[in-house]
């Protein structure tokens, strides 16, 4: 069996999981989210532990068991604590401003770039060169962060651009004459 699927998901206090007709519903203090369970995977709940196992003994079923376990664990963390991603704007004159569900970026183009955040993702700008994105949905948060980063990805020569706070940009040396 998959190494990931062997580890059970522990439910923290205040989080409940219900299963009805292959649909897993997770409820917590930050809302509720649902996940469609794959047909090759079955789930058992014992007190505050959720255990995943494949329904048939095949490599594909084991892979799906690990994937479903990771997805459910992300839902549990999302409805309990939520997720956060930080983006840094590095470059002269690069600025960001969050208003409502829009992020306005000045990143070296002749016009400001406006990005509308997807439903469930919120943004704040503690400084003009930092964007903090928060959401319960890890996948949606990562996609929104990647879309914002895509407007001006970090370049390898000067390191200018939009980068994740934990991202290390490999620098290149300029061409010698």
Swiss-Prot record:
Key words, A-Z: Ribonucleoprotein, Ribosomal protein, RNA-binding, rRNA-binding
UniProt superkingdom: Bacteria
A GO term from the CC aspect: cytosolic large ribosomal subunit
Pfam families: Ribosomal_L6
Biological process per Gene Ontology, one example term: cytoplasmic translation
InterPro entries: Ribosomal_uL6-like, Ribosomal_uL6-like_a/b-dom_sf, Ribosomal_uL6_a/b-dom, Ribosomal_uL6_bac-type, Ribosomal_uL6_CS
UniProt feature coiled coil, ranges: none
Molecular function GO terms recorded: rRNA binding; structural constituent of ribosome
Transmembrane segments: none
PANTHER family assigned: 60S/50S RIBOSOMAL PROTEIN L6/L9 (PTHR11655), LARGE RIBOSOMAL SUBUNIT PROTEIN UL6M (PTHR11655:SF14)
Function: This protein binds to the 23S rRNA, and is important in its secondary structure. It is located near the subunit interface in the base of the L7/L12 stalk, and near the tRNA binding site of the peptidyltransferase center.
Family listed: Belongs to the universal ribosomal protein uL6 family.
Subunit text: Part of the 50S ribosomal subunit.
Annotated protein name in UniProt: Large ribosomal subunit protein uL6
């Amino acid at each position: 069996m998959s190494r990931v699927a062997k580890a059970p998901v522990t439910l923290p206090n205040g989080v409940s999981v219900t299963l009805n007709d292959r649909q897993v519903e997770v409820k917590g203090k930050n809302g509720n989210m649902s996940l469609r369970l794959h047909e090759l995977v079955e789930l058992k709940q014992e007190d505050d532990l959720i255990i995943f196992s494949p329904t048939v003994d095949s490599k594909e079923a084991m892979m799906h068991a690990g994937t479903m376990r990771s997805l459910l664990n992300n839902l549990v963390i999302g409805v309990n604590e939520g997720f956060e991603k930080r983006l840094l704007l590095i470059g002269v004159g690069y600025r960001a401003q969050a208003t409502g569900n829009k992020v306005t970026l000045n990143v070296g183009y002749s016009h400001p770039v406006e990005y509308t955040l997807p439903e469930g993702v919120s943004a704040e700008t503690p400084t003009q060169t930092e964007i903090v994105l928060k959401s319960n949905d890890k996948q949606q948060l990562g996609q929104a962060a990647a879309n914002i980063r895509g407007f001006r990805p970090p370049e390898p020569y000067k390191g200018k651009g939009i980068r994740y706070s934990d991202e290390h940009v490999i620098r290149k040396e300029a061409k010698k004459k």
